[in-house]
Each structure stands twice: as structure tokens, then as C-alpha cells.
Swiss-Prot record:
The gene is ksi. It comes from Comamonas testosteroni. Changing P39A: Perturbs active site geometry and lowers activity. The lineage of its organism: Bacteria, Pseudomonadati, Pseudomonadota, Betaproteobacteria, Burkholderiales. The keyword Lipid metabolism applies. Substrate binds at D99. Keywords: Isomerase, Lipid metabolism, Steroid metabolism. This is Steroid Delta-isomerase. Its EC number is 5.3.3.1.
Length: 125
């Protein structure tokens, strides 16, 4: 079983890689057979190639990502609240999701689900 410290460190690396636009760093956190459902209710992306494509599209704009609460990590699962800020066509937007990671025995993310909806998307200042 993964320790809370390991899972928290993975979340911190994920946030840092998003901020740096580090596609390889993000993809390296996931198992080869992982799934990403972002947002929840959308078609899950499965496998390294699909996950790479998803994050490559996500990183087309510079992102400012910040954890807003402590990471909750227990029993091979972690959840974390954060904000993602970006500017598109002169308009700043802030999204406030909660992501849920599930880990395999090797410490890799096997499932990522992003929970957010319209009420969690705001015009930035």
C-alpha cells in the first residue's frame, strides 16, 4: 500500500508539472493502463497515448495551478482541491476542481477523476 507521504508527493509533482507545462512529467505519474475522466461524466481516456493527448491539449495555454487545501491521502487514494487559472482571448478564468487519484502497488496513478461543474468555473479578476 502507498503511504500518505508518497501519494501527497505525487500530487505535488502533478501540480508542479502542470505549472511548468511539463507534459512528460505529468504522463510519468500515470500507469500505462491508467484512465483519466476529466471532467467526471465525460468519456474516460485510457492508456498512455490518450492521457498524453489530453494533457497536451490542456497545456496549450499557460496554467497557474495552486492547491487550496491539504491533500487527503489514504488506502491507495488521494483527493485534493485546487484552482486552475488561465487566460484565453483576453479573459481570465478560474476553475476550482477536486481531483481524485487512485494508485497501484507501484505508486503510479491508475485513475484520475476531476470533479467540477459550471458552478466551479469563475471569471478571474
Amino acid at each position: 500500500m502507498n503511504t500518505p507521504e508518497h501519494m501527497t508527493a505525487v500530487v505535488q509533482r502533478y501540480v508542479a508539472a502542470l505549472n511548468a507545462g511539463d507534459l512528460d512529467g505529468i504522463v510519468a505519474l500515470f500507469a500505462d493502463d491508467a484512465t483519466v475522466e476529466d471532467p467526471v461524466g465525460s468519456e474516460p481516456r485510457s492508456g498512455t497515448a490518450a492521457i498524453r493527448e489530453f494533457y497536451a491539449n490542456s497545456l496549450k495555454l499557460p496554467l497557474a495551478v495552486e492547491l487550496t487545501q491539504e491533500v487527503r491521502a489514504v488506502a491507495n487514494e488521494a483527493a485534493f482541491a485546487f484552482t486552475v487559472s488561465f487566460e484565453y482571448q483576453g479573459r481570465k478564468t478560474v476553475v476550482a476542481p477536486i481531483d481524485h487519484f487512485r494508485f497501484n502497488g507501484a505508486g503510479k496513478v491508475v485513475s484520475m477523476r476531476a470533479l467540477f461543474g459550471e458552478k466551479n468555473i469563475h471569471a478571474g479578476a
